[in-house]
Design a protein with these regions (language model features):
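N-terminal leader/signal peptides at the extreme start of proteins
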Residues: 1-13
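N-terminal single-pass transmembrane signal-anchor helix
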Residues: 11-36
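Generic leucine side-chain signal with a strong bias for well-ordered alpha-helical environments
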Residues: 17-20, 30, 50, 54, ...
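Amphipathic alpha-helical protein-protein interaction surfaces
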Residues: 26, 46, 80-83
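Flexible interhelical turns and helix-capping residues at alpha-helix boundaries
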Residues: 31, 43-46, 68
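Aliphatic-rich helix starts adjacent to a transmembrane/signal segment
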Residues: 37-54
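Low-complexity, acidic interaction segments enriched in glycine
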Residues: 55-134
Length: 134
């Protein structure tokens, strides 16, 4: 009697449930480590953009006051007089309408209604300061 061993190819098998669970756990662990850093870097980028916009507008206000001998009446006047190309978008609120325009202090005895500008965003920056105080 001869024994014949057949060499049949077995069909390729998929991953086991345990292997899939282990891979998903590793992916979840890596995501939980990376996601907070990603969102923190997005927030830091928005804060940097806010500082840049505020500095640009404040420089334009000062230049307007030096040229005209008075402060502008609004941010729109800065754009109309070409001291800024256009009113920037507040990176924290995503709107051009949330800028807070501050009038000159009474002790300056200055004309014009726009002395400083701040963000209208609520909350605190990553360093703990209020956005309203920037």
């Amino acid at each position: 009697m001869s024994l014949r061993f057949s060499r049949t190819r077995r069909a390729p098998r998929g991953f086991t449930l345990i292997e899939l669970i282990v891979v998903m756990a590793i992916v979840a662990l890596l995501t939980s480590i990376a996601a907070p850093r990603y969102f923190a870097s997005l927030q830091k980028g928005r804060e940097t953009a806010l500082l840049s916009s505020l500095n640009t507008m404040r420089d334009a206000i000062d230049q307007f006051a030096a040229d005209k001998g008075r402060y502008p009446d609004s941010l729109q006047e800065l754009a109309q007089q070409r001291y800024i190309r256009e009113l920037p978008e507040d990176p924290l609120t995503g709107s051009r309408d949330t800028w807070v325009e501050l009038a000159p202090p009474s002790e300056l005895q200055a004309t014009g209604r726009l002395w400083d500008v701040r963000s209208g965003a609520a909350g605190r920056a990553s360093d703990g300061r209020l956005f309203a105080d920037w």
